[in-house]
């Protein structure tokens, strides 16, 4: 929710239909889409630094709303604070409360919105459709992923937008509990700590910024050099005990992914988040010798296609068959993310693609030759009930009634479900691609078959954990343990992509 939401008008109105039109009054002039925010700096290929949000949407979202104080503590010694008004302080700990500050003039925000989307990737595809038509569209995540554009923009083909208008009359401001009493800070607030900042049971090196976002709230951002960032990502994504070649492959992918996605939160003034909506980023100091070696051995190496970092997506387990990009997200196929059986030649020969329904059943029943078959969710089973399906479709249950059927409408070449139909006595709801797992979060993947049991119950037999595109971490661990190099592993999962050093030959993120 945006702060000081005193008006929410014209929600779910089609293009060309404004509340003001009904009275004959002239529509209001176009306003800003969101609170003004400076874009994060461009990344220097020679000395790449990422702005990573350690905490987003900080502070209350409305007058009278409660928000916990922000506690910032130096690992040892002191923190140096400087706010935009030039105030400075050196203290071992900062405790920041929030005060609601009225605006001198109300801020009217008006935008046309597509979404919500299940992922940034799907939202970005819709944004690209708008941009191709000359519309200045941005991707934002107030809660779920959305695409915002000027209110008069015509919807791109295949999507129906809604108009959102809010009038904000105030916003939260940070108030430092100083020894001399409460002191209102002017953002952005910069923080430095020679020993690092204690955060989320770890220590981060910084420097840091407390800055405003596109929603009228605040974000705690760490400005972290790319190679140090990897120390906080690699062990948490693949596991510090993985074989060295698997760690090195993960380091290249994490680096490539970060650069390719450095625009992900541009609307909020930073590059990346620190949770599963980006790459899980935690205390870099916890990286062991093997992780540091993998990062050092691949220093500044990225995978590219036509000189640009690729979509370096990866996941835990593909269940024995990799997904194509277009099977996971709405978008065109990518030449380096293709569906493929992930196993030795004998397994590839047994299961030619596209997989037929009987072949998929056979693969799920066996497939132990596949790389990464020792993963805990290489094979799985889930039971869905009518009550659970009704919960999953939310408001749509009002027009379908209690679910009575569950049917796969479409599969991709790898056998993954592209469209899942939930049937009711009054209608149907179709979940597509990444929206399937967004709605049914208990499903480890979209590689599954459906069997109806007794009335109102369905059994799903599936394989893999994650979206299935790109590198399978379980598969990479298997291949590394068999002596494959990191380069060979990357060539296997991203055929045709080139391994390049960032900053050489004009290479830029």
Tell what function each PLM region has:
Residues 1-7:
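Sec-dependent signal peptide recognition
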Residues 7-12, 16-509:
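Conserved, single-site charged/polar hotspot
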């Amino acid at each position: 929710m945006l702060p000081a939401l005193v008006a929410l008008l014209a929600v779910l109105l089609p293009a060309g239909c404004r509340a003001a039109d009904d009275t004959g009054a002239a529509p209001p002039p176009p306003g800003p889409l969101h609170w003004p925010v400076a874009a994060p700096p461009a990344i220097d290929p020679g000395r790449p630094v990422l702005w990573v949000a350690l905490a987003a949407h900080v502070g209350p979202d409305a007058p009278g709303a409660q928000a916990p104080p922000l506690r910032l503590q130096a690992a040892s010694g002191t923190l140096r604070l400087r706010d935009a008004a030039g105030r400075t302080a050196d203290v071992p700990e900062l405790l920041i409360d929030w005060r609601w500050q009225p605006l001198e003039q109300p801020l009217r925000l008006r935008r046309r919105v597509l979404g919500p989307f299940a992922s940034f990737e799907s939202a970005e595809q819709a944004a690209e459709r708008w941009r191709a038509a000359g519309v200045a569209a941005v991707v934002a995540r107030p809660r779920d992923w959305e695409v915002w554009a000027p209110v008069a923009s015509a919807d791109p083909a295949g999507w129906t937008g809604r108009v959102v208008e809010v009038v904000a009359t105030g916003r939260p401001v940070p108030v430092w509990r100083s020894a001399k009493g409460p002191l209102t800070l002017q953002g952005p607030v910069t923080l430095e700590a020679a020993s690092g900042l204690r955060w989320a049971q770890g220590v981060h090196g910084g420097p840091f910024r407390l800055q405003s976002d596109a929603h009228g709230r605040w974000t705690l951002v760490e400005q972290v050099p790319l190679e140090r960032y990897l120390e906080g990502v690699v062990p948490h994504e693949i596991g510090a005990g993985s074989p060295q070649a698997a760690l090195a492959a993960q380091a290249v992918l994490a680096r490539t992914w970060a650069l390719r996605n450095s625009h992900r939160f541009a609307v909020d003034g930073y590059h990346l988040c620190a949770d599963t909506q980006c790459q899980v980023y935690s205390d870099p100091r916890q990286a062991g010798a093997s992780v540091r070696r993998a990062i050092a051995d691949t220093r500044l190496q990225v995978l590219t296609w036509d000189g640009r970092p690729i979509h370096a997506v990866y996941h835990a387990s593909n269940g024995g068959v990799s997904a194509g990009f277009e099977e996971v997200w709405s978008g065109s196929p990518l030449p380096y993310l293709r569906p493929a059986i992930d196993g030795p030649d004998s397994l590839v020969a047994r299961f030619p693609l596209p997989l037929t329904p009987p072949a998929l059943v056979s693969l799920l029943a066996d497939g132990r030759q596949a790389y990464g078959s020792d993963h805990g969710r290489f094979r799985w089973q889930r039971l869905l009930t009518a009550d659970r399906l009704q919960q999953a479709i939310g408001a749509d249950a009002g027009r379908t009634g209690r679910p009575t059927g569950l049917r796969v409408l479409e599969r991709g070449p790898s056998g993954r479900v592209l469209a899942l139909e939930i049937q009711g006595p009054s209608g149907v709801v179709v979940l597509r691609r990444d929206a399937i797992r967004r709605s049914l979060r208990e499903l480890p993947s979209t590689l599954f078959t459906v069997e109806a049991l007794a009335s109102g119950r369905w059994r799903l037999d599936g394989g893999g954990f994650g979206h299935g595109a790109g590198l399978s971490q379980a598969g990479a661990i298997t291949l590394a343990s068999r002596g494959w190099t990191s380069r060979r592993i990357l060539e296997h999962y991203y055929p045709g992509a080139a391994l390049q050093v960032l900053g050489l030959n004009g290479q830029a993120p």
